[in-house]
């Protein structure tokens, strides 16, 4: 396996955490997870995540079992019904974020690249993602960004991957293939050439076999 320079440079940090934790974070980063760089603390990484109101138990699960071991974390409701301008409104989203930590700084260097045109960092698929991916990653990826898809008699799972390029989606398909999961690309946006990954219906049982023991209660989607 060839390693890129960035991955080699952060291997000591990566190797300092259990594989199960790394695999979980990978699944989250393929889904709704985000890492930003603090403007106050010398560009150190902060992990954050926003999900709908129905996913609060899942966010607490991630916080309690994964992210709180690195730093203190804080939850926010949106809209903030304690504010006068939001009085009477229903909460639609929950957001949590960590404080800065060297692990998140290191992972940011893998998961993001600077885009001059957009003048910001954009999320990418890391070159060595195969070293950080397992069935645990798949389970959390599905819980983050999986969708039960039923068209006629065809029942399967869609993974929301339109934030990644077609080439990156193909890389992600190769990860699924290593788990003996077949998939196809489903066009989402022809103009911008964006795709979702559709798990082949013949592989649905394989997916369930791999992830059901990992998915938390109330988030087994099929």
Language model features with spans:
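Internal intein/HINT superfamily modules and their associated LAGLIDADG
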Residues: 1-222
């Amino acid at each position: 396996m060839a390693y890129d320079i960035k991955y080699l440079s952060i291997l000591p940090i990566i190797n300092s955490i259990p594989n199960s934790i790394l695999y979980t974070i990978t699944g989250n980063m393929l889904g709704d997870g985000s890492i930003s760089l603090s403007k106050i603390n010398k560009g150190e990484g902060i992990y954050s995540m926003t999900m709908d109101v129905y996913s609060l138990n899942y966010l607490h699960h991630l916080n309690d079992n994964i992210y709180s071991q690195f730093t203190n974390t804080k939850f926010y409701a949106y809209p903030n019904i304690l504010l006068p301008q939001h009085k009477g409104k229903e909460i639609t989203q929950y957001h949590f974020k960590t404080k800065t930590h060297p692990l998140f700084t290191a992972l940011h260097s893998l998961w993001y690249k600077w885009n001059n045109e957009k003048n910001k960092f954009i999320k990418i698929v890391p070159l060595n993602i195969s070293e950080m991916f397992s069935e645990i990653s798949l389970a959390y990826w599905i819980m983050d960004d999986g969708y039960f898809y039923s068209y006629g008699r065809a029942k399967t799972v869609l993974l929301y991957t339109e934030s990644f390029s077609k080439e990156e989606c193909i890389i992600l398909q190769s990860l699924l293939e290593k788990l003996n999961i077949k998939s196809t690309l489903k066009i989402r946006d022809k103009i911008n050439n964006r795709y979702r990954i559709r798990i082949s219906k013949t592989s649905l049982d394989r997916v369930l076999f791999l992830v059901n023991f990992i998915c938390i209660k109330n988030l087994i989607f099929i």
